[in-house]
Amino acid sequence: MSADPPITPELVAAHGLKPDEYQRILTLIGREPSFTELGIFSAMWNEHCSYKSSRIHLRKLPTKAPWVIQGPGENAGVIDIGDGEACIFKMESHNHPSYIEPHQGAATGVGGILRDVFTMGARPVASLDLLRFGAPEHPLMRHLIAGVASGIGSYGNSFGVPTVGGSTKFDRRYNGNILVNAMAVGIARQDEIFYAKATGVGNPIVYLGSKTGRDGIHGATMASAAFEADAQEKRPTVQVGDPFAEKLLLEACLELMKTGAVIAIQDMGAAGLTSSAVEMGAKGNLGIELDLDAVPCREPGMSAYEMLLSESQERMLMVLAPEKAAEAEAVFRKWGLDFAIIGKTTDDLRFVIKHEGEIKADLPIKELGDEAPVYDRPSVLTPRPATIAADTIVPPISHGEALLRLIGSPDLASKLWITEQYDSLILGNTIQGPGGDAALIRLGDGPKGLALTADVTQRYCEADPYEGGKQAVTMAWRNLTAVGALPLAVTDNLNFGNPENPKIMGQFIGCLEGIGEACRALDFPIVSGNVSLYNASEGQDIPPTPAIGGVGLLEDASRGATLSIKRPGDAILLLGETQGWLGASLYLRDICGREDGAPPVVDLALEKRIGNFLRGLIANRALTAVHTLTDGGLAVGLAKMALAGGIGARIDIPGHCPAHAYLFGEDQARYLVTAAPEKAEAIRIEAEQLGIACQLIGRTGGPTLELGQEASVAIEDLRRAFEEWLPNHMTGIVIE
C-alpha cells in the first residue's frame, strides 16, 4: 500500500482549495488533515457542492406555494398535482464532462438526474435537455454535437424514459465550454416520497447498485474550475454510465421502498460516497461511520481516498431499518445488484472513515457542509444598453430572404437530426414531443397531463441580465400556457462564467433578481435547481445562461393546444402589443450583423393577464392552434406554425412600425393563435375588455406565406431551409 503524499501548498492548490480556505480547515479541526481528509474537504467545499459563491443570492428566490411539497435542498423538488399524486423534478448540468468526453459526459448527465428523481420514490416519466454549442464551424463542434446527441439518446432510450423536449442553440462563446443541462420528471404518491435525512442511531448504512471504480474521481472539483488548454487531460474525471444497470437500480429501489425498509436514501452523484454520506448524516444531525473494506470495488487496490471520491455511476446509499436488512438484500440480489452494509449512523456528529484497520478520516460532519466558505463576491452590474429605434435599422435584404435565412439559421433550424436519436414515445404517454412550445405527457389512465419546457435566451441575459432573467421565466410560463397548462413550478440551472470576475458576478446577481421578480409575479416558485459556475475556457466566459425548466398541469390533456395550422380559412389573431423591438434580436444579429441594443422589456402583469385569458380560450376549445412568439418574432412564429401543419397563410402588415420590425421584432407577452372565422370577433372583443391587445391579422390557407405586400415565400422553400441545415452540417460524421 502506497504512503499518502505530504500535505503541501501545491497539493492543497491542486485540490481546488485556496490558502485562506485551507487555513479555515486547520482552524476547524485543530490539526493538519490527512490526505484522505483533504480530499473530503476538497469535494465538499468546491463550488459544485457547497454553492459558496451563490448561496447568499439563492436565498432571495421564491420557493414556497400551497402546492409545493418540497423545495430546494433535497434531491429534487416536489409539487402537488392533485389526486394524491406528486410531480418530482430537477435540472442539473454536466457541462465540463460533456466537453471532455461528449458521449459519456452527456449520458451520465442523464443518468444522474434520473437518479435524483427516483431516489425520492418517483418513477421517471420524461426527460428534457438544454444544449448550448459553440460556433457550428468550429473544428470540434461536429464531434461534440454528435457525441452529446448519441449520449443522451443511448442512455435515455436504454433506461426507458422518453426524451420529450428541450432547446439547442449556438454561440461562439461556447466554443471551449459547451452546456449540457438535463432535466428529469417523475411521478409518485404523496405518501410515498423518500428523503435524504438519516434518523436513528445505530442504523445500518447500505451501499447499493454498481461497483466502485476509479472513474470520475474529483469530477465535482473539475466541474468547479475553468478550463485551460489541458482540458483533454481530464478525461479520467469523466464517469462511465450503464443505463441497463440504472434501470435495475430503479426497479430495485422502488420495490424496496414499498417494504418499509428505507429510512433515508441518497444517490451517489457529485463527490460520490463522500457527499451522499455527509448529506444524509448532516440533515439528520447524526454522525456517520463507514468501513470502506466492505465497499464493492471493480478495481483492486483502491485507496480510501479513491473510494470516497469516485463518481462511478448507478450507485445509491441508504439508511435501512435494521430488521429489514435481510429482506432488502434479497431484493437487490434478485435484481443482480451489489448490496453491502458499509457503516452505521452514530450520535457523535463525526464523519469517521475506516479502511484496512486504520482510521483514514475523522471530521465534524456538520461543518463539512455548514462551515464551507460563503463568499459575497465583488460584482459590477451590467448597465442597460441603449434602446434601438426600429426606423434606424435599414433592412440589408428583402423580408422573404430574411425569413428564409432565419428559419434555416443554427438557432432556429430543425433539430430533428438530434432529437430523432431520442425515443420520445417510449412508455406510450407522450402527446407532444420535441418541436412544440412545450412537451405534453399523459398521466396514467386519467385525463390529466403534464406540460414540460426548458429554455433560456442568453442574448437577452447578456445584454441586460435583469430583463433577461425575467424573460427566461416568462418564456417558460408562456410555453406551458401555450399548450393549455397551468404553470406550477420551476427548476433552474444557472450556468455562468468565472464568479471571481466582478462582471460575471454582476450578471449572476442581475439574472437572479429578474428571475425572482418574475417567479413572484407569476406564482411560479423555484423548487429545485443547480448552479454551474466557472464555465470558461482559456479566459473566455460563456454568456450568462440561466436555464429555466418549467412544469405545468392540464386537468384534461385532451384539451391541450398545439402550434400546427389545422385547416385553411381559419382566422389568425395576434395577442399582445407589437412595437417592433429589434434590440438583441436574432434579426439584428443574423441579418444585420449587429449584437447590440437593449432586449425587450418584460411586463409581468401583462404576461399574467394574457396568459390567464389564453388558457381559458384553450380550455373552451375556442382556438385551433397556439404558438408563443420568441426568437425571430412574428414571421418566424407563423412560419413554424405553417411548417408544422403543412398549410400556408396570409397576413396584413399595419403601418404603425416599420415592416421589418413588425415581422421580426421580438416583443414579449405575445401569442399567435388561429380560430374558426366565426369565433374571431368574439375573441377580439373579450380580449379588449380585459385590456389585452388582439388584432385579426390574416387567414390560413394556400401553399405560401404571404407577408402583406412585402414577401411571398413558398412553404416548401421554408421547409427546405428549416430541415436541411443541421443534416447538411453534420454530413460525414462518424462517432468513434
UniProtKB/Swiss-Prot annotation:
Query: Which Gene3D superfamilies does the entry mention?
Result: PurM-like C-terminal domain, PurM-like, N-terminal domain
- What's the domain of life for this entry? Bacteria
Q: Record's Pfam families?
A: AIRS, AIRS_C, FGAR-AT_linker
Q: Where in the cell is it found?
A: Cytoplasm
- A single GO CC term, please? cytoplasm
Where is substrate bound in this sequence? 93-96, 115, 239, 311-313, 532
Keywords, ordered alphabetically? ATP-binding, Cytoplasm, Ligase, Magnesium, Metal-binding, Nucleotide-binding, Purine biosynthesis
Renumbered to this chain, the signal peptide range is: none
Keyword Ribosomal protein listed: no
UniProt binding sites for Mg(2+) 2: 116, 267
Which residues are annotated as active site?
A: 48, 94
The record's catalysed reaction(s) read: N(2)-formyl-N(1)-(5-phospho-beta-D-ribosyl)glycinamide + L-glutamine + ATP + H2O = 2-formamido-N(1)-(5-O-phospho-beta-D-ribosyl)acetamidine + L-glutamate + ADP + phosphate + H(+)
The Gene Ontology terms for molecular function here are:
ATP binding; magnesium ion binding; phosphoribosylformylglycinamidine synthase activity
Q: Where does Mg(2+) 1 bind?
A: 92, 530
Give the EC number(s) under which this enzyme is classified: 6.3.5.3
Q: In which pathway does it act?
A: Purine metabolism; IMP biosynthesis via de novo pathway; 5-amino-1-(5-phospho-D-ribosyl)imidazole from N(2)-formyl-N(1)-(5-phospho-D-ribosyl)glycinamide: step 1/2
UniProt KW Ribonucleoprotein keyword: no
Q: What class of enzyme is it?
A: ligase
Q: Which family does it belong to?
A: Belongs to the FGAMS family.
Q: Which PANTHER family match?
A: PHOSPHORIBOSYLFORMYLGLYCINAMIDINE SYNTHASE SUBUNIT PURL
Q: What does this protein do?
A: Part of the phosphoribosylformylglycinamidine synthase complex involved in the purines biosynthetic pathway. Catalyzes the ATP-dependent conversion of formylglycinamide ribonucleotide (FGAR) and glutamine to yield formylglycinamidine ribonucleotide (FGAM) and glutamate. The FGAM synthase complex is composed of three subunits. PurQ produces an ammonia molecule by converting glutamine to glutamate. PurL transfers the ammonia molecule to FGAR to form FGAM in an ATP-dependent manner.
Q: What is the protein's quaternary organization? A: Monomer. Part of the FGAM synthase complex composed of 1 PurL, 1 PurQ and 2 PurS subunits.
The entry's protein name is Phosphoribosylformylglycinamidine synthase subunit PurL
